[in-house]
Amino acid sequence: MESSTTTSYSVVSELEGTLLKNPKPFAYFMLVAFEASGLIRFATLLFLWPIIALLDVLGYRNGSLKLMIFVATAGLHESEIESVARAVLPKFFMDDISMDAWRAFGSCDKRVVVTRMPRVMVERFAKDHLSADEVIGTEIVVNRFGYATGLIQETNVDQSVFNSVANLFVDRRPQLGLGRHIISDSPTFLSLCEEQVHAPVPSNYNGHNQRLHVQPLPVIFHDGRLVKLPTPATALIILLWIPFGIILAMIRIFVGFLLPLWAIPYVSRIFNTRFIVKGKPPAQATTGNPGVLFVCTHRTLMDPVVLSYVLGRSIPAVTYSISRLSEILSPIPTFRLTRIRDVDAEMIKKELSNGDLVVYPEGTTCREPFLLRFSALFAELTDNIVPVAMNYRVGFFHATTARGWKGLDPIFFFMNPRPVYEVTFLNQLEVEATCSSGKSPYDVANYVQRILAATLGFECTNFTRKDKYRVLAGNDGTVSYLSFLDQVKKVVTTFKPFLH
């Protein structure tokens, strides 16, 4: 192979097995089935996995692909598939990226990704995070009402990909092709490329990319309830665990209501829940003295409850917007902010005069090791500021959602076999670090953000609540408040496995 350092190259790369280490797309269809539909579709696709694997072994790759697409998407609205592709799949794709393949792919100016998966599942990730110019994949047939039929337009997927690449490069063949060496009756897109590199791409391929040290654009916001990629083995474990998880969650929540707050960290060990406390929490404010403002990182809806558990007393929390059910279930008082600055400032001052209070300047949760921009409002209202770094670990289910219903966040948290919460109390801010010393509220907020990020090993960002919800849900993150009957219906439909 000729060595070249030119940046004018065009590249066509296969996604499965090349840019992604995993050559099998089955787990990604499982994600679509679970997140866009429910447990019945998820279980059905899992039970068909032996047939899908057998078809692959026998050489019927198109047949196995069409079966996966049909079971995962038939009856789903196109917007639901797009929503999962936008909010859920990028995280799992990014976790499986081959950096050697990325370096070769990222060194070229014109980048084309080819995949056997439906284009709608891949396009958002490839363009946003891999800077791809074009994505060539299968096309799902959608009826006039916007629902997927489960069928695809292509009869022979490999031949269709070959034709699409050929039509895209009419004037000149692509210089570089990255892909697996596959025996096929149809010509593959690699035969169109001047230079062909078979996966896995060597780590020292061509010795170029000397100028390129950039990483793929990281996934900061993502959604979905599943923590682990649902490979066949993992998916089976999750399915078997769910009934036990629901029972365990109900027991844990009931115990939390029954016992005093100070006893929860001790009793929770019996139910395999751990609370790790670091640092020295401040003493409770005495009568007549203003309370302490706990300024916390925001990881889940459970943050203020866990803070009250480890302090052994009820600490009221101010929230931007939570569901009515979450307010009813909360063992601590919550106060909803109006988003009107003067009104919110007056309310926080009033609550601080009554005792301690907890605020979350990020305004929303973030799952990845990043902190969103801190609102400076808290810095204007008091000098008694105690930063608290909060983080959590779960094994099966995420306890946050942007697309789903937030009222179920605590249930999903307690459905995990061994949830762990870490609470680190930092020292109260010195007077020199507060607005009393002449610092602006923005300087104070940025300082608190930096020390909390350093404590957790996170990175600071300028992203906001609105940025998160625009990426994940296409809205500004405001919760719509439903009637009690509607809340009950939503619980039932969430836990009732269904197939569209």
Curated annotation (Swiss-Prot):
Nucleus among keywords: no
GO BP term, pick one: CDP-diacylglycerol biosynthetic process
Pathway participation: Phospholipid metabolism; CDP-diacylglycerol biosynthesis; CDP-diacylglycerol from sn-glycerol 3-phosphate: step 1/3
EC number per UniProt: 2.3.1.15
Top-level taxon of origin: Eukaryota
UniProt entry keywords in alphabetical sequence: Acyltransferase, Lipid biosynthesis, Lipid metabolism, Membrane, Phospholipid biosynthesis, Phospholipid metabolism, Transferase, Transmembrane, Transmembrane helix
Membrane topology: Multi-pass membrane protein
Motif stretch (HXXXXD motif): 298-303
Tissue-by-tissue expression: Weakly or not expressed in roots, leaves, seedlings, developing siliques and flower buds.
Keyword Secreted carried by entry: no
Transmembrane stretches, start-end: 38-58, 235-255
GO molecular function, one term: glycerol-3-phosphate 2-O-acyltransferase activity
Catalytic activity: sn-glycerol 3-phosphate + an acyl-CoA = a 1-acyl-sn-glycero-3-phosphate + CoA
Gene Ontology CC terms: membrane
Compartments reported by the entry: Membrane
Function: Esterifies acyl-group from acyl-ACP to the sn-1 position of glycerol-3-phosphate, an essential step in glycerolipid biosynthesis.
Family in the record: Belongs to the GPAT/DAPAT family.
Record note on domains: The HXXXXD motif is essential for acyltransferase activity and may constitute the binding site for the phosphate moiety of the glycerol-3-phosphate.
Identification of the protein by name: Glycerol-3-phosphate acyltransferase 7
Organism: Arabidopsis thaliana
Organism ancestry: Eukaryota, Viridiplantae, Streptophyta, Embryophyta, Tracheophyta
Gene for this chain: GPAT7
